[in-house]
């Protein structure tokens, strides 16, 4: 069921209740070849609700798990990113894994890899040196990659999941990680419907911009001028204008089509900006009405969380 949140996103607290760490926390160790996508994987896991810690010293992991389980809200899903650049990384994750399992935690290891050609291309694009390049025999990028492959061979062999990102787009990697670590359900698609005034500029983060300046402006009606589109007297006026309902439902259909495509591409956030001249009357009324329509939509294409915000309301 779609949830509608107006002006601010409601906080969602995980179920309360005491229990063992095993019941409360699961851990995934994210590692693999440099350039294979660890950073991207960490961002995806964060979007999926995991708390991500980068190169945490092994002696602090157990303490962090305990503190996270006792936090409010508790940290129930912890992703530990570990790579060869860390002075704590030995190439053998058995000590770390044993620590976590001794606490009764479900612990998995994710290993990311890619072909040499792709890794070389990615490093060239980013204009970075490989972290083990200076340790290789001839100091070349390809030699650094070879050293890392040897060093991480045991880690790869012990991993619960190995993902080769050679042919994967970011969105394809997102889907694979969602299948493995999403908890059995797709991550929520969060939609923001934002009203604004064109005279203050179009929102830079807008994925879709709707222009409602074709509707009659309540500003020129003295008894409506001081009211906003959040008030019934203005919203009823705006929504009853010729073409308003057709436009509203057409936009709803367009947003549904777009959110469906966003889901397929692994995207999780979308902002629809609704603009009028000053961001007080027409855009506010249409944004509220569009948010209600999307919020009442139970189809598979609809967003899961809808937030309605008014950027320029009160700015005049």
From Swiss-Prot:
MF terms per GO, please? ATP binding; GTP binding
* Disulfide-linked positions: none
The record's listing under Pfam families reads:
PapZ_C (PF22740), RapZ-like_N (PF03668)
**Where is GTP bound in this sequence?**
83-86
Say if the entry is tagged with keyword Zinc-finger: no
Please tell me where ATP binds in this chain. Answer: 32-39
Matching entries from NCBIfam families are given as:
PRK05416.1 (NF003828)
What the protein does? Displays ATPase and GTPase activities.
Full protein name = Nucleotide-binding protein NFA_35930
To which species is this protein native?
A: Nocardia farcinica (strain IFM 10152)
